[in-house]
Each structure stands twice: as structure tokens, then as C-alpha cells.
Curated annotation (Swiss-Prot):
This is Neuraminidase. Glycans are attached at N46, N54, N84, N144, N398. Its EC number is 3.2.1.18. Ca(2+) binds at D292, G296, D322. It comes from Influenza A virus (strain A/Duck/Ukraine/1/1963 H3N8). Substrate binds at R116, R150, E275, E276, R291, R368. Residues 32-86 are annotated as: Hypervariable stalk region. It catalyses: Hydrolysis of alpha-(2->3)-, alpha-(2->6)-, alpha-(2->8)- glycosidic linkages of terminal sialic acid residues in oligosaccharides, glycoproteins, glycolipids, colominic acid and synthetic substrates. It is found in: Virion membrane; Host apical cell membrane. GO terms for molecular function: exo-alpha-sialidase activity; metal ion binding.
């Protein structure tokens, strides 16, 4: 075969392959059109099929694109029933770890929000960690000066419990430098306080939509719980403070249904001080253990009935649970009056167990370090000093901070009582450490039928970060 014949032969074969390839593409297009046409989708290539199962578990969302199926499982609650929450609190012999977010450790290299005041609240299908961001990330220049409590950049956001407060999974809830949140069985309600100190406003969101507001009535830093509010049979309750942090202030209980205020009452508490209440449902009422920033090292106790009548006093136990505080041996306790003459304080909690009380406190008497929870026999009703159990959660070599309460609803736990749970904030950075920022992580514990060994589930981040060395 001479050279010209070789060229002609190669050219013919190449042309044949090109024609064959074109025919294959034409056939592929025809088959695709015919197949999609028979599907009855009027020529639309993309469609989303949502199948709702009556299991109140999830929605199965199937996105179909040509011959590719993507299945995404979306948490779902039928939204048709309010949680009861009138059950009694379960009796707890100890507290087991529920979650730990390790946010600051991860934040040395991850995209983690600078936060304070984390807290946990639960719906019938999940628990979420809420937190107040500073509108900045760890190890970033905007984290400078975040020791400040109130700024226009602070927002309430949330993640599923156990997740770090990261930018990829966090959900926006409200603009806020003080907040509370709870679920009534149908939707989440959040209360976010923001604005200037003298004219702050609390915006109530229900199902993610603003539904009502509370304006500052005393003109002195309107603020709320920094922990879960409480919903009973569809109505949700929370406590607000307006006035000085170190002398007599004004206190109110609010009641809302579907995010709209349906009742409020002023709390008469002359000589006493209430703020940052940690509340939970118990036997059809709301029980709160609060912070006295004025004089008491014992904690105020507030019990709220559905008709907004209330009883207010102090935790009777003859052992103090606020910080700073004096020696246990020098404290006598009182059910009605502040004791100890130590101001400032820190947010804390307690759980009634019949006439006993579980109460959390820092291990240090003078600083926010270490954390333990004590069960005091008859401590809810008497000035008893009898400790019948003690459990260490953070050792005294490590920083702690705020702490607060919440419960697992029976829909979530499967029990016939409300499981008592608490969280402990572990503050890092300023003012105790040489950084430009202040942030925190948290450990969450829930009540169990067994005693649990002491251990230290501390924050564990190695400081300073790179940004602190610049």
C-alpha cells in the first residue's frame, strides 16, 4: 500500500469513528428525553420529592437529577402537640456526661465563634446548645476586646448539642447580648435582648419569626436568664431583671403562648436580688434557682405557678453555692433572707429532689475555677448541712464559669419523669489569661440512676493562640 492509500484509509477510519460518536450522542439524547417524558414531569429535569412519614421522626427528601438520587434526612416533628412537662423531676443518684463541645481547642485552627453564656434546651426530638457570639472567630483580629458583655455584634445562635459553635453548622436565632430559649413541643421560642443599656429591647421569636417585644421598663440593662426558659402545656415562662446588679432592682415573670405575651407579673422581693435564673419544670410548676449579685452567697429560689402566682425566697441549705463565698462552716443558711454578705456572684443552678436539693458550685470560694455538684439532705426546705453525695465535674486547677439547668422531656427520654441535666461553662482568655479575647466551651451532664466517679472534663485548650502573640 503506497503512502497516499495509507492516508486515505486512516482518514476514512477517523471519519467513521466521528460519525459513530455523533450517532451515540444523538441516541443518548433521544433516550433521555423519552425516559423523562414518561416520568410525567412536563419536561422538568430537576424535581424534589418529599415524603412525610407519620412516625414524627424525619422527612426523607429525595432530589432527582437525571439518573442521580441524593437522599437527605431532615429532622422532623409533626408540630401538632404541645409538650406536657407537668411530670416530676426524676431522682438522680449521679450525673453522667451528655456532651462536650471542645470549641476552644478546635478553634485554634477551626472556624469557631467567640462565645459566652452557652446553655442547652431540648425539644421533643433534640437538644440544642445556644450561645451568644461576639460576631467574631477565635484566633482572628476581631476577637480583640471580646471580654465586653454588650455590643451590637452579639447574636444568639445554636447548634445540635455536642457540636462546637462553628460557622458551618450554627443557626441564627436572634440579635442579642442576653437571651433565653425553649421549645413548647411545636416550635422554638427565643428571647433576645439587645440595644443600648438605657433602652434595651427583648425581641421574642417563635418559629424563627419575631412575634412580640419587651421594652426596658427601668432603663438599666434589661436582661434575662442566659439559660433555658420553661414551657408547660404550651405556655412558656421566663424571668427578666431591669436595674442595678449590686443593689435593689426590678424583676418580672413573663408568660407567652406561641411567642406572644399573654401574662406578666412583678416580683416583690425587697432586700433580695434576682438575676440569671436557672429554671426547669417540676410537678406542673416552674422552679428557678437564681443569682444574687447584691449580698447573698445563698441563691434566690423562685417557684412559679401557671396562673403567675409565685413564691420567692432563698435556697434553705446551710451550705453556700454562689461565688465568691465564705467558709462552709461559717455559713448558717436561710430560707427567706440573703446570707453571707458577698456581692457579685455567678450564674448557678439547683434541682429539688423531694425535700433534698442538688446544687452546683465552683470548687474555689473566691474565683470561677473547678466545679462540683452536691446533694444536701432536706436542703430545699431546711438549713441542713448534711451532704449525702458530691461529684466533681471540673477540678480546681481549671477554669469554670456560669452553670445552668434544663430537663430532658419525656418525649425525648422515654421515661415517665423529667431527667435533670446541667451544663458548666468553662471560660478561657481574659481577664484571667494573657489573650486578647474571652470565650468559653461547655460540658453537659444528665442525671442517672447510678453514682458517677469524680473526674475533670475541663476545657483543655493550650493558650495563647497565634493571634495573641502578634
Amino acid at each position: 500500500m503506497n503512502p497516499n492509500q495509507k492516508i486515505i484509509t486512516i482518514g476514512s477510519i477517523s471519519l467513521g469513528l466521528v460519525v459513530f460518536n455523533v450517532l451515540l450522542h444523538v441516541v443518548s439524547i433521544i433516550v433521555t428525553v423519552l425516559v423523562l417524558g414518561k416520568g410525567g414531569n412536563n419536561g422538568i429535569c430537576n424535581e424534589t420529592v418529599v415524603r412525610e412519614y407519620n412516625e414524627t421522626v424525619r422527612i426523607e427528601k429525595v432530589t432527582q437529577w437525571h439518573n442521580t438520587n441524593v437522599v437527605e434526612y431532615v429532622p422532623y416533628w409533626n408540630g401538632g402537640t404541645y409538650m406536657n412537662n407537668t411530670e416530676a423531676i426524676c431522682d438522680a443518684k449521679g450525673f453522667a456526661p451528655f456532651s462536650k463541645d471542645n470549641g476552644i481547642r478546635i478553634g485554634s485552627r477551626g472556624h469557631i465563634f467567640v462565645i459566652r453564656e452557652p446553655f442547652v434546651s431540648c425539644s421533643p426530638i433534640e437538644c440544642r446548645t445556644f450561645f451568644l457570639t461576639q460576631g467574631s472567630l477565635l484566633n482572628d483580629k476581631h476577637s480583640n476586646g471580646t471580654v465586653k458583655d454588650r455590643s451590637p455584634f452579639r447574636t444568639l445562635m445554636s447548634v445540635e448539642v455536642g457540636q462546637s459553635p462553628n460557622v458551618y453548622q450554627a443557626r441564627f436565632e436572634a440579635v442579642a447580648w442576653s437571651a433565653t430559649a425553649c421549645h413548647d413541643g411545636k416550635k422554638w421560642m427565643t428571647v433576645g435582648v439587645t440595644g443600648p443599656d438605657s433602652k434595651a429591647v427583648a425581641v421574642i421569636h417563635y418559629g424563627g419569626v419575631p412575634t412580640d417585644v419587651v421594652n426596658s421598663w427601668a432603663g438599666d440593662i434589661l436582661r434575662t436568664q442566659e439559660s433555658s426558659c420553661t414551657c408547660i402545656q404550651g405556655d412558656c415562662y421566663w424571668v427578666m431583671t431591669d436595674g442595678p446588679a449590686n443593689r435593689q432592682a426590678q424583676y418580672r415573670i413573663y408568660k407567652a403562648n406561641q411567642g406572644r405575651i399573654i401574662g406578666q407579673t412583678d416580683i416583690s422581693f425587697n432586700g433580695g436580688h434576682i438575676e440569671e435564673c436557672s429554671c426547669y419544670p417540676n410537678d406542673g410548676k416552674v422552679e428557678c434557682v437564681c443569682r444574687d449579685g447584691w449580698t447573698g452567697t445563698n441563691r434566690p429560689v423562685l417557684v412559679i405557678s401557671p396562673d403567675l402566682s409565685y413564691r420567692v425566697g432563698y435556697l434553705c441549705a446551710g451550705i453556700p453555692s454562689d461565688t465568691p463565698r465564705g467558709e462552709d462552716t461559717q455559713f448558717t443558711g436561710s430560707c427567706t433572707s440573703p446570707m453571707g454578705n458577698q456581692g457579685y456572684g455567678v450564674k448557678g443552678f439547683g434541682f429539688r429532689q423531694g425535700t433534698d436539693v442538688w446544687m452546683g458550685r465552683t470548687i474555689s470560694r473566691t474565683s470561677r475555677s473547678g466545679f462540683e455538684i452536691l446533694r444536701i439532705k432536706n436542703g430545699w426546705t431546711q438549713t441542713s448541712k448534711e451532704q449525702i453525695r458530691k461529684q466533681v465535674v471540673v477540678d480546681n486547677l481549671n477554669w469554670s464559669g456560669y452553670s445552668g439547668s434544663f430537663t430532658l422531656p419525656v418525649e425525648l427520654s422515654g421515661k415517665d419523669c423529667l431527667v435533670p441535666c446541667f451544663w458548666v461553662e468553662m471560660i478561657r482568655g481574659k481577664p484571667e489569661e494573657k489573650t486578647i479575647w474571652t470565650s468559653s466551651s461547655s460540658i453537659v451532664m444528665c442525671g442517672v440512676d447510678y453514682e458517677v466517679a469524680d473526674w475533670s472534663w475541663h476545657d483543655g485548650a493550650i493558650l495563647p493562640f497565634d493571634i495573641d502573640k502578634m
